[in-house]
Curated annotation (Swiss-Prot):
Stated family: Belongs to the D-isomer specific 2-hydroxyacid dehydrogenase family.
Species annotation: Haloferax mediterranei (strain ATCC 33500 / DSM 1411 / JCM 8866 / NBRC 14739 / NCIMB 2177 / R-4) (Halobacterium mediterranei)
Catalytic-site annotation from UniProt: R226, E255, H274 (proton donor)
Gene behind the chain: ddh
Name of the molecule in the record: D-2-hydroxyacid dehydrogenase
EC number: 1.1.1.-
Amino acid sequence: MHIERLAVDESVGRAMPPQRFIEALSDLGVPVEFAGEDEQFGPGDAVASFGHRDAFLDADWVHCIRAGYDEFPVGVYEEAGTYLTNSTGIHGTTVGETVAGYMLTFARRLHAYRDAQHDHAWDLPRYEEPFTLAGERVCVVGLGTLGRGVVDRAAALGMEVVGVRRSGDPVDNVSTVYTPDRLHEAIADARFVVLATPLTDETEGMVAAPEFETMREDASLVNVARGPVVVESDLVAALDSGDIAGAALDVFSEEPLPEDSPLWDFEDVLITPHVSAATSKYHEDVAALIRENIEKIATGDELTNRVV
């Protein structure tokens, strides 16, 4: 494979300013061009994109600027002989800090005070409501880049960290690593259950009514994975019934979250618009990955984060 051009698809604008991304790639060694929706591709072309377009299949290589590539038809890329890479590995810090923020918000009741501020109300919490994260247990489901970013920050806050990992292999700062078949055991005693898994056939619908019934009544769910990992109707029912105390949700089965979703109206639900990995340096992080792979193509080495 020989790359003669990198096309920056207009869809990257959903995650970062395209021009800043192009400028970050100015030293790439090949022309870097903005590509609109009618752009055509051919041999020698590489594409950086937020989502899939059929025209990309005529290029040699497509880089997804996100970690999640579930919108890309992997089998079709394989049949077309088009390389596909993703941006996993660069989100640990941002997502880890976001999750730490969620947990601190619930523990210190910051969301309740913000709500009261909007009403110009000097509302004090009930004595039993505020708590500290130190000594509390968090279960991180999925111990890849995202999960480890959460683990390290939770450990720094003095939390007891357990996790769920397909292999069951040990991870630094995680006291116990469970395999997925022991999910209920892993989440049963956790004050927070953090979902940081990719969306696969195995993880779709992984958290539903039985899991909410297993969780502590004072526990909160945090989802920075993918919306369909959780059965949303069961989550609403669990919040309604008091099976769990709250949830911090960055991802949803349907995005944007519909205006009539009952999730908007729970006092102890934090909703963010799929931005847990957002950072003003994102264009630089993705550019570094692309630069690394351009160099690997030149030397014939295996691409970093190759999906197909």
